Amino acid sequence: MTQRVEHTTVMDRLAIDDLVTGYAIAVDDGDWAAYRALFVPDGHVDYRSAGGIAGSADAVADWLDEMMRRFPVRQHLIVNRRIGVALRDGGAPGDTATVQADYLNPMHLAGPHDAPPGASAGASAAPNYTCAGRYVFAARRAAEGWRLTEVVVHEKWRQLLPAHA
């Protein structure tokens, strides 16, 4: 590999890693415009293994918007990222990539004692619902940079703790 190819590969991997981080932040912040902007127009998302839906990125963003209202405090931790960039003939990076990444998602279910938006949540923000599993992301290079073509959630476990008074 030449230095130019190695540099391009590193830059692609960083951009793809940033795309995955952007996914977590958009969901945690409830920023559905940013969520939609992560995808190509025909992007697809599958949350069925976690009891959700499968559909277009727009349809899933609408579903997540409704579902995440139950969890005023949430934080996706996406780790163990394995990024694979397809190669062209000659070893140059191609225009498609896949990422397998584990996630841990502690959340706090909404309740009568939750702080109002913008206020300090204090002790009521302790996570009482946690789920974990693996994301499989597919991405392709677009005019505006790397964008997601597909996200599949493979939930492995979940835990619901009793609410504390």
State each model region's role.
Residues 11-20, 94, 102, 107, ...:
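Binding-site signature for planar aromatic cofactors or substrates
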Residues 18, 74-77, 130-132:
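Short solvent-exposed loop/turn micro-motifs enriched in small/polar/acidic residues
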Residues 32-109:
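A solvent-exposed, acidic/Ser-Thr-rich amphipathic alpha-helical stretch
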Residues 20, 76-80, 122:
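Short structured motifs
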Residues 67-70, 123-128, 140:
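Short aromatic-glycine motifs in intrinsically disordered, low-complexity regions
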Residues 1-41:
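Short, low-complexity N-terminal intrinsically disordered segments enriched in polar/charged residues
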